[in-house]
Amino acid sequence: MHTAPHTACSDARSMRALLLIALLVGCNSTNPGKPSGDDQPQPDAPTSKLDAPTPPPPDATTYRYLCDAPLPVNATLPAQPALPAAGCPVLAPGSNTITSGGKTRSFLLVEPASFAPTETLPVLFLWHWIGGDANDFLVRGEVQAAADEQRFLAIIPVSEGATVFGTSLNTKWPFDITQLPTRMDEEFLFFDDMLACAEQQLHINQSCVSTIGVSAGALFTDQLIQARANMLASFVSLSGGVNDVIIKPWTGTGAHKPPGVVLWGGDGPPSMDGNKDILGCFGLGMDFSVASRDMETGLVADGHFIVECRHNCGHVEPPLDTPPGESKFASMWEFAMNHPFWLASGQSPYTQTGLPPSMPAWCSIGAGNSVPRSGDGCPAAENPCQY
């Protein structure tokens, strides 16, 4: 076999070839457009790029929920309420009593199973409907199972009552135009005091405090989010709204624009769903489709991110089609835990990932974009004056 003579020149050519290959491989491995870059994590990379000219979108895939992510550098933090003047009780799972504004008030505290003292969790405030109470929300909302599986703390207030002036209608929570500012402030202070005591005694994620209400509880939630947007990260309004008939209007949330879910149970004829989400008590006829759309108008004008959900079952418990293994309202809790306080106005991880699988098909990002639920399978009808 013929073999080329071994020379210094050939050694030099071989060395240059090896150097060229090494250079090409090196350049290719650092190509930022290469899909396999995810296989080479950079553990020392900063957790926030808020100072960069074009910051990356929030990532809800690296963590189960965005509220699990580390607090970004220079993140905007919520205001923190002062401790109640009468002090805090020793909080425990179950019923708790507190003195707020000189009155004795109560609430349920739900902790997840195996809650460790060092575990930092989001807090969800849950406001019940007219015919229900705090325990009804706990049971029908499957809140304990949800807290165990999704890892959050829940505070379920007990209502003091709120009667519409000139009627005997007790809406449980103050939201109507006959409620004086002093009554509204009393309920806002109750929220402040519950939150302050939770912050004092529990390791809570202060950037992930949300308010969620159903029917009358949603109507109050929609007032609370305006009054305490400097403390609340997000909201979920399930058959709520503003401005219709006797409901107080939308006046805005100020500098912080909390993202929210706006859900209702139908627009009625002549719309395609054929059912109307209406509370026809004492001839007042509050229409939650009108009230919800009125709130959407205010939210859009002010620059909030919203998810709109429309079902076709009227004023009943939402017919949420939850994936197997998850609690009934898992998608609503998930929304709250994916929208921390530090998100910029109008920002959401859902704009990058789309809605999660737990969210009903009749929900969509943005006002007017949802396709109403169709078909049967609605929950049993309830007395609209009781739900």
Identify the meaning behind each predicted range.
Residues 107-108, 123-127, 152-158, 208-213, ...:
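Structural recognition of the beta-strand scaffold that forms the well-ordered cores
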Residues 89, 100-108, 119-207:
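Serine-hydrolase catalytic machinery in alpha/beta-hydrolase-like enzymes
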Residues 230-322, 327-330:
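The feature captures the conserved acid-bearing segment of alpha/beta-hydrolase catalytic domains
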Residues 24-26:
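C-terminal motif of bacterial Sec signal peptides marking the signal peptidase cleavage site
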Residues 33-34, 41-43, 49, 53-123, ...:
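A domain-start/cap signature at the N-terminus of enzymes
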Residues 28-31:
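Bacterial signal peptide processing site
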Residues 1-14:
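N-terminal secretory signal peptides that target proteins for export/translocation
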Residues 13-21:
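Sec-dependent signal peptide recognition
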